[in-house]
Amino acid sequence: MQSKFIVIEGLDGAGKSTAISFVRKYLEKNNLAAIYTREPGGTKIAEELRNLVLHNKYDEEIHSDSELLMIYAGRVQHYRNLIAPALEKGINVVSDRFYWSSMAYQGGGRGVELSKIRALNNNFLNGCEPDLVIYLDIDPILGLQRAQKVGSPDRIEKAGLEFFNRTRKVFKDLVKDLDNAIEIDAAKSIQEVEKQIYLILDKHFNFQN
């Protein structure tokens, strides 16, 4: 079976880590090799850039365009050094976020032109598209409440409710426009989310239970 690139997307607090644990359980049950990674981050250099974007310790504002470019610098490292080589070796890749997050957070939330983000993806990632995107939809208020229970808010989580409303809108628009994307109501029970993920994997990849 050809290797697959699966991405889990959603607002902070949507339950992406839990969803990835379900994907891992499913792939392992079917004896399918996979690596599990995240963005921002995924490689040593990309993780350094992640820390700068999320926990800026300097007395200097990060411009929206600069934020986008730092994230994309990390994404290029991540894609070329980890994602692409794994897929070429026949290993599945499951990522917590990919370029959709830039479309939603930097495009929708920060107001960066979506055409700029698409250009970065086309020019530096060879227009890479995941085989499957599972988008976990959640009301921003509930998502932020969940995220705050996990730890102190990072720089982006402090952006405010309207920021996350704009971010959510772009996520939902992306789901409507792309055939390889499925939306799950992340406010439902963990058991229901798990069931939906398994059904999605069955449908898209014809894995055997």
Swiss-Prot record:
Question: Which GO CC annotations does the UniProt entry carry?
Answer: cytosol
Assigned EC number: 2.7.4.9
One Gene Ontology term from the biological process aspect of the record: dUDP biosynthetic process
**What name is this protein filed under?**
Thymidylate kinase
Q: Which SUPFAM superfamilies match?
A: P-loop containing nucleoside triphosphate hydrolases
Known catalytic reactions: dTMP + ATP = dTDP + ADP
Q: Which GO terms describe its molecular function?
A: ATP binding; dTMP kinase activity
Q: Which CDD domains match?
A: TMPK
Q: Which organism is it from?
A: Francisella tularensis subsp. holarctica (strain OSU18)
Q: What does this protein do?
A: Phosphorylation of dTMP to form dTDP in both de novo and salvage pathways of dTTP synthesis.
Tell me which InterPro entries the record gives. Answer: P-loop_NTPase, Thymidylate_kin-like_dom, Thymidylate_kin_CS, Thymidylate_kinase
What protein family does this chain belong to? Belongs to the thymidylate kinase family.
Keywords recorded for this protein, A-Z = ATP-binding, Kinase, Nucleotide biosynthesis, Nucleotide-binding, Transferase
Q: Which Gene3D superfamilies match?
A: P-loop containing nucleotide triphosphate hydrolases
Q: For ATP, which residues are the binding ones?
A: G10, L11, D12, G13, A14, G15, K16, S17
